[in-house]
């Protein structure tokens, strides 16, 4: 060995090899850790904090601080999570918030409770549910479907992902209601492990948006989900002549992206580097426009949430860009309000730098669709109106609310009543004493939040 090191030729070759390894290592570090680990972008908005009611709060605003328990573990559960909600009988005097959730983390029996008074009180657990719902394997999502002829259906979707100990994922399950959620079909599986196109879905469908054809509404809906390799899929829902649901073969939609100059590009690599998932899809112009926006969770937390747009009903998408810090988070759920603004709930992710972060818990952004579009198009610091901390999620050892909060929350059901009330259902450790993770809801109106924000902006605190 000593003779080798005395050999100048060997030393030169060894030095060159080590230099090459160092350069390669630094290049890989840049490619996978620095290039895809960005500094946080976009300023922060002021936050209206509804976790603690200040002294002197006007009586008509006190309700904003009232968190309603939906299910504290009525069946003895210590952990309940991942609700979703749909509004029944919208625009009538009998509006009902229908909330479905799971008795466990992701997997477990599905439960349902309803509220007929805008989230002030909730029913007991409904008992006339499909037998197959007792063995749900993942987060449920529920949507109302409106048809061209005026007919309505409701659809509930629950994925079958590859949990630890499972050999594979097993597609996604679907139930349909045609009677205002009074009854449901049993689960029907699509794209399971024994199908021609086996899939391993997670959070199916994180979004389900109605599509247009030639500018007019069609009886088609685009559903989005991801798998355990962070491949992002779309599948198109239609119904046959007998009213049975059909889903098109899933396809990776970010392969069909286009740069600002019109050049085709594949955004799947960037999506995988960020571990983009749980994508929400929002239609412009109060849900009536011809543009779609997607925004999703950057699971590495080394980039902000990512956004893109489509003007051809999801056939192609613009390049992915980071969203502003004001909406950085996980499992975004967006709805329009009667005044044309948008509310978006999510699990807060506050990035302190390239590699560190904390959460402020359960957050709702208030702004306009156009605010986020301006940010995307020009980098203009268009961040929206303000944020709302809906409730405090307690970290271990916390005895009172603070800025930093638990991150095991979000996955909200969000409905907007005809009078403008917004009912948000979520899950979390909402008290310091019980140690339980349970389902709760908060009801707010933007006109009342605006009053609190005006006071906040005036005092600067």
Each language-model region and where it sits:
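N-terminal Sec-pathway targeting helices
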Residues: 2-21
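Hydrophobic alpha-helical membrane-insertion segments, chiefly the h-region
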Residues: 20-31
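Compositionally biased, intrinsically disordered low-complexity segments
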Residues: 15-16, 26, 285
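Asp-box/BNR beta-propeller blade signature and adjacent active/binding-site loops
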Residues: 31-461
